[in-house]
């Protein structure tokens, strides 16, 4: 890599690191580009050379965290052979990753409300990606008989929602414990939820599936 290109890349990363600190301290709306430039030890023009505006910096930080999370999850899942073990590995990695990036967790999951439609769309996309990942492994678990048949789309959303709520509670706590210590409890609750389907009468599962199908069929009512 040419020296000038390397310096540009290093400056780009330095700006993002500085932005993480400033955003985490002042929040998205309270942060000025001038403050990011000062923290990054560069000029305001130097920041704008890499990013057209504050929102672009924010989105780049979000993408950075999402990429880290995705890579770690894929690596952990690839080491497991059983579908439930893969889902458990994904859960564990998500908690471990947020545990080591508390500033970013608080920033994106708590303080980013109102950051704009582009950020909201990106957040929805990321949530859907990870919910689909969980659903894939739950589908595999159903297929091999590891868990009883169930509405895996709803179960995956519930899993993601539970993780999301635990991370938010930890991120805003004044004296948070270790996020990764929550793993055994969350794991037990989530696995108990999907395995409890085997204790339901057969027609109960059928009714859930029928209701889910009806919801899918009427899903466009809100747009009419």
Where are these regions (language model features)?
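Hydrophobic/aromatic residues within well-ordered alpha-helical segments
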Residues: 11, 54, 61, 65, ...
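Hydrophobic alpha-helical connector segments
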Residues: 60, 74-103, 155-159, 183, ...
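Amphipathic alpha-helical packing segments from all-alpha helical-bundle domains
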Residues: 67-70, 117-144, 153-157, 181-184, ...
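Amphipathic alpha-helical segments used for helix-helix packing
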Residues: 99-120, 135-136, 168-172, 203
């Amino acid at each position: 890599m040419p020296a000038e290109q390397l310096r540009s890349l290093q400056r780009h990363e330095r700006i993002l690191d500085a932005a993480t600190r400033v955003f985490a301290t002042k929040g998205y709306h309270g942060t000025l580009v001038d403050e990011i430039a000062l923290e990054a030890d560069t000029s305001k023009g130097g920041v704008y050379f890499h990013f057209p505006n504050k929102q672009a910096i924010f989105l780049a930080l979000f993408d950075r965290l999402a990429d880290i999370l995705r890579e770690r999850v894929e690596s952990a899942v690839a080491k497991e052979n059983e579908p439930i073990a893969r889902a458990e590995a994904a859960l564990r990695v998500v908690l471990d990753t947020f545990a080591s990036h508390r500033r970013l967790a608080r920033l994106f999951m708590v303080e980013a409300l109102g950051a704009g439609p582009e950020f909201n769309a990106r957040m929805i996309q990321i949530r859907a990606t990870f919910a689909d990942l969980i659903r894939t492994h739950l589908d595999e678990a159903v297929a091999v008989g590891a868990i009883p048949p169930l509405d895996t789309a709803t179960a995956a959303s519930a899993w993601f929602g539970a993780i999301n709520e635990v991370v938010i509670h930890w991120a805003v706590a004044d004296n948070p414990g270790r996020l990764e210590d929550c793993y055994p409890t969350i794991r037990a609750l989530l696995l108990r939820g999907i395995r409890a389907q085997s204790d339901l009468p057969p027609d109960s599962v059928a009714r859930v599936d029928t209701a889910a199908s009806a919801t899918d069929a009427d899903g466009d009512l809100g747009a009419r």
